[in-house]
Amino acid sequence: MNTQQLAKLRSFVPEMRKVRHIHFVGIGGAGMGGIAEVLANEGYAISGSDLAPNVVTQQLVALGATIYFNHRPENIRDASVVVVSTAISADNPEIIAAREARIPVIRRAEMLAELMRYRHGVAIAGTHGKTTTTAMISNIYAQAGLDPTFVNGGLVKSAGTHARLGCSRYLIAEADESDASFLHLQPMVAVVTNIEADHMDTYHGNFDNLKETFITFLHNLPFYGRAVMCIDDDVIRSIIPKVGRYITTYGFSEDADVRITHYEQKGAQGFFTISREDMPDLDVVLNAPGRHNALNATAAVAVATEEGIADEHILAALLNFQGTGRRFDFLGNFSLEHVNGQEGEVMLVDDYGHHPTEVDATIKAARAGWPDKRLVMLFQPHRYTRTRDLYEDFATVLNQVDILLLTDVYAAGEAPIPGADSRSLCRTIRQRGKLDPIWVSDVENISSILAGVLTDNDLVLVQGAGNIGKIARRLAETKLQPSLSED
């Protein structure tokens, strides 16, 4: 950002008093790195720590940030404030050192709230679809020339980054309910895509607590703000009477204010009509597969319509939507000749979905777009607690594919829970009589295992939120060839 642009920004977003140097503990995460990127472009000195380099840290270094690949007390030297990821424990040496030095220690959402304080904030919350919906809204605003700032939990492909600093008053941000820290946000517009049981440890295992937290989040809106809510979701429908704010509903339901009709999927694109009260219908071509993405797009349309963005910009942004990282991410078609000597090719897709509802939506999108393909899924469960709490749902959803390979659970720092592991899940699915799942004890052998099961016209879906994305990229880089990917 040049001096003139920064001066324009400072006309409505003042500096944070004497804060000059901001340190991030766990800076390599997408959400943390995105905020750091925006602040770096605003002119703040940025430092941070994490355990290993990745794309996020590389981008920040290119912006002038100082990154430490360790956690040591001296890393916070000269910091004005320390921002902490939810993945970082309270006994981290940098946090201890900051508290001893009386340096403020805040959570990621508190810093995001500070970015939003003087801007027109659009916050996207919900159990599923936040990242994609955030990207769609950001793309529409950019298409309309509104130059928004955005902070997303995933890669926005059109921008090549998780976050971007714009010169306008608009800030579009993904709002994370996993630790209830989204309650720090005070947006002008709030989207809630759906509400399901997830991250229940935060809510003491009580679903009513989760619902009440979402209601509180919506009441952070000013009385003149706008809640955009998916009325197809039964939980959202149940809480609407408790939300004392202006509401726009959206969905396939007949009583939705912004309604989807005539949905059809052809390959990776969705075709549908959106009807709006007292406005012309929109015939949408969405460059993203699945009914779930039609819902995400309709949330974006509702927000854009509320802001008065012209239909031509809305339609162009959705037609040209490039997607987000690891959300039905097409990695290529690969010949089987060098994989197992067969003729033909297979399609490789990478997807982040790790909740049964998300996995189900991805499977349905794959079936609808490529009905003639056999679906081969490599699934990595994420967290033992989630596997335990949603065990039967996982068994039911995973039973829909044609070939299933299961890796060990990605623990994300959790201790193993008996009966909530991948081998148990394999046994349960096998007992249902349709599939004979393959347990992958060592992901280093995955290419050889795939070579033994793949045939022409298969769709290989690599699914999960842990390190399985790295496996997907390696499979693509080596074109699924065992001898290359397992050297």
From Swiss-Prot:
Disulfide bonds: none annotated. Keywords: ATP-binding, Cell cycle, Cell division, Cell shape, Cell wall biogenesis/degradation, Cytoplasm, Ligase, Nucleotide-binding, Peptidoglycan synthesis. Pfam families: Mur_ligase, Mur_ligase_C, Mur_ligase_M. The keyword Cytoplasm applies. One of its GO terms (cellular component) is cytoplasm. GO terms for molecular function: ATP binding; UDP-N-acetylmuramate-L-alanine ligase activity. Its main location: cytoplasm. ATP binds at residues 126-132. InterPro entries: Mur-like_cat_sf (IPR036565), Mur_ligase_C (IPR004101), Mur_ligase_C_dom_sf (IPR036615), Mur_ligase_cen (IPR013221), Mur_ligase_N (IPR000713), MurCDEF_pg_biosynth (IPR050061), UDP-N-AcMur_Ala_ligase_MurC (IPR005758). GO terms for biological process: cell division; cell wall organization; peptidoglycan biosynthetic process; regulation of cell shape. Pathway: Cell wall biogenesis; peptidoglycan biosynthesis. It catalyses: UDP-N-acetyl-alpha-D-muramate + L-alanine + ATP = UDP-N-acetyl-alpha-D-muramoyl-L-alanine + ADP + phosphate + H(+). Its EC number is 6.3.2.8. It comes from the Bacteria. It is an enzyme of class 6 (ligase). It is found in: Cytoplasm. NCBIfam families: murC (TIGR01082). Belongs to the MurCDEF family. Cell wall formation. HAMAP family: MurC. This is UDP-N-acetylmuramate--L-alanine ligase. It comes from Proteus mirabilis (strain HI4320).
